[in-house]
Amino acid sequence: MSKRPYCIGEGLKKGAWTTEEDKKLISYIHDHGEGGWRDIPEKAGLKRCGKSCRLRWTNYLKPDIKRGEFSYEEEQIIIMLHASRGNKWSVIARHLPKRTDNEVKNYWNTHLKKRLIDDGIDPVTHKPLASSNPNPVEPMKFDFQKKSNQDEHSSQSSSTTPASLPLSSNLNSVKSKISSGETQIESGHVSCKKRFGRSSSTSRLLNKVAARASSIGNILSTSIEGTLRSPASSSGLPDSFSQSYEYMIDNKEDLGTSIDLNIPEYDFPQFLEQLINDDDENENIVGPEQDLLMSDFPSTFVDEDDILGDITSWSTYLLDHPNFMYESDQDSDEKNFL
């Protein structure tokens, strides 16, 4: 069984409500309360539809209805609920106390909808409009020709300064300076390395010869002293020889100068000159960057048995020789540099 429609019969009034109609409706609802909207028009003596009476009471005549401007918070609630629920005004009005759905709908259509369009937002989808920026800012174009002309004018006005030189000439000058500096550094490095290789090899050879001569002298003096001391313990020697030997031991400071070892004197200066000449020849053969070792020389140059002729004269000659060089701090710095 279907419901009875709100409006039946003929001669129903439509349009704006009058003051008399409003008073009749208010008086009946105060006496009988809300509800039964299909029967209210007949009972209240109104020639109106039941739906029209309900809407008139709910939206206008109800005493607790909130009138006036919508606050900022109410506007934000309407916008957010409309984005999620759409045009369901009764649902939106439930979240706004004392606000009717009709009032919310009217306020949306007259205020909020136009405001969103002005802000570039679609009132239906609540997304930015495609043509939200009718006058887009064109990208700034850079005029390279104008910029080059300005640079040329500024370079001509400051022709007396070094900055007015062409860029290519500045680059060429910088490259030439860098290349010349690299050439000087490389040449200095090679010459320093060559000089260090020559001087260090000669000094090592001379120092090795001096150290060898000194060690042989120490060994020989020790062996002579041991030979002279060994007969002192034997009992088969005559007393006269032992007494003379004890006297020699007591005066051993004169022993080194009084004993003739019968070792032929070796011509060390001639040996050293020959050694230096051979060093120069070997350096020219192997190149400036290779060091010469004692093993590179023939073993026939030095006789270890005859090299101990006069140790004192050898040391003096080594110290006085112009090509004899000690390994100084400068040589060690050059090693670190290499």
UniProtKB/Swiss-Prot annotation:
GO CC annotations on file: nucleus
Protein's gene: MYB76
Major localisation: nucleus
Keyword Iron-sulfur annotated: no
Superkingdom of this protein's organism: Eukaryota
Induction data: Slightly induced by auxin (IAA) and jasmonic acid (JA). Accumulates upon mechanical stimuli (e.g. wounding) in inflorescence. Down-regulated by sulfur-deficient stress.
Entries under Pfam families matching the protein: Myb_DNA-binding
Cellular location(s): Nucleus
Protein name, entry field: Transcription factor MYB76
SUPFAM superfamilies the UniProt entry points to: Homeodomain-like (SSF46689)
Subunit text: Can form complexes with MYC2, MYC3 or MYC4.
Record organism: Arabidopsis thaliana
